From Swiss-Prot:
The modification Phosphoserine is found at S304, S340, S343, S348. Residues 303-318, 335-347 have a biased composition (Polar residues). The gene is Esam. Glycans are attached at N111, N172, N216, N239. The keyword Cell membrane applies. One of its GO terms (biological process) is bicellular tight junction assembly. Residues 1-29 form the signal peptide. Residues 156-243 form the Ig-like C2-type domain. This is Endothelial cell-selective adhesion molecule. Residues 300-372 are annotated as: Disordered. Its main location: other. InterPro entries: ESAM (IPR042757), Ig-like_dom (IPR007110), Ig-like_dom_sf (IPR036179), Ig-like_fold (IPR013783), Ig_sub (IPR003599), Ig_sub2 (IPR003598), Ig_V-set (IPR013106).
Amino acid sequence: MILPARTPETSLLRVLFLGLSTLAAFSLAQMELHVPPGLNKLEAVEGEEVVLPAWYTMAREESSSHPWEAPFLIWFLEQEGKEPKQVLSYFKGSLSNKPGVTLVHSISTRNVSLRLDALQEGDSGTYRCSVNAYDSDGKNIGHSIKTIELKVLVPPAPPSCSFQGVPYVGTNVTLNCKSPRSKPTAQYQWERLAPSSQVFFGPALDTVRGSLKLTNISTAMSGVYVCKAQNRVGFAQCNVTLDVMTGSKAAVVAGAVVGTFVGLVLIAGLVLLYQRRSKTLEELANDIKEDAIAPRTLPWTKGSDTISKNGTLSSVTSARALRPPKAAPPRPGTFTPTPSVSSQALSSPRLPRTDGPPPQAVSLTPGGVSSSTLNRMGAVPVMVPAQSQAGSLV
């Protein structure tokens, strides 16, 4: 490659080119964002507000912007493990911002400070401010970026107090205190209120865990114990009452607890028994009931049957024997006996006695008809079982 010979004119052009390049680079780097020294890391309390201070300047120019200057401003929030998110942007009079995020000053003053209202713990992170300046022709005349780290502190939430162990004389009891939320982590302090005021220290007190160990307690250690959880931005407290019992008092309390437990068990048992009984009665009411077996009926004997029971003989006539035989029509004025059937044999009626010889007994059938008459009529004597007054056969 052949290089042209260096002449004074060529050297001058080279110097001019390098100078213009330097001026162009300086013009792009003439914008600068500023953050006050020591304010690039801020801390604020949850629920309050904070201002992230920042402004930009143009080299060798006044602090106020020119009419032809058009800044493009963006504030980002960067959090660990999350994508950056835009919280505010401004360009040519158009402002877009999240709720609770505003600019402190007008953009024409080149002050781009950011205000955050009603802070929450989730607002912690690194805020990045980016400013690009354009001229009236839309040419970029400067760009700068600054970051501010914000840490939102949380005062301790009200803690909860409790104790472990049975507080009677000679035993050990541990008092516990814990706040569910605190940033930074809360430190704990225990003290006993008047009339026997006392502040506790290690090794009985664990300021990180919030526990206080009381050993070989006595009745003099009874009282109200207060736990205070605190950090750099606030504190909260709770209390617990310790009533040290003697042996007899402890026995009474234990008996009351056991009695209560037994009573609850008995009540539960009665309720279950009542429910089971009600269920059983309901099932019985819904069952289909069968009728009782009817008593057996004895068949009537036929006219020709003869039954002897316990030596009792009775005479009955069957339906066949009761049929009158075919005979000549009765004479006028003659009585025709009608046979009757009875389930019991009737004794012959006794006639009044006279001085004459005793009358001969006449065997009559029930209804006043003699057996001889029935025999002439064709009746057949049969034996049937007799029936007692209770309805049973004899």
